[in-house]
Amino acid sequence: MSDFRRNCIEQKLLVGTFAAIPHPVAIEVTAAAGVDFLCIDWEHSQISRERIEDLIRAADVHRVPAMVRVPGHAAEDIAAVLDAGAAGVLVPRVSTAEQARAAVKATRY
């Protein structure tokens, strides 16, 4: 189990931030600032799917877990960010149990 996951399960206080600038240097600077995690905001920024992996790797350089807020409920977007190495996925606008089940199902492959 990753330290990030363990800390979340143990409900430890973590400090993180959202990142919407689609450049690896911006992610590296933010990660180097000492945050416990980053959330790359794919939903509200103009980031290509190809760039997501670069941003996750930039956070990895500083051993900072990077979650990604995906643009919607599409299973292929959820799978893509996990394939790219995201430490977690934030799925927006989940309003029903069925949507939650579908999002969880998309993480299992």
Where are these regions (language model features)?
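Expand to "…catalyze enediolate/carbanion chemistry for C-C bond making/breaking, isomerization
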Residues: 1-109
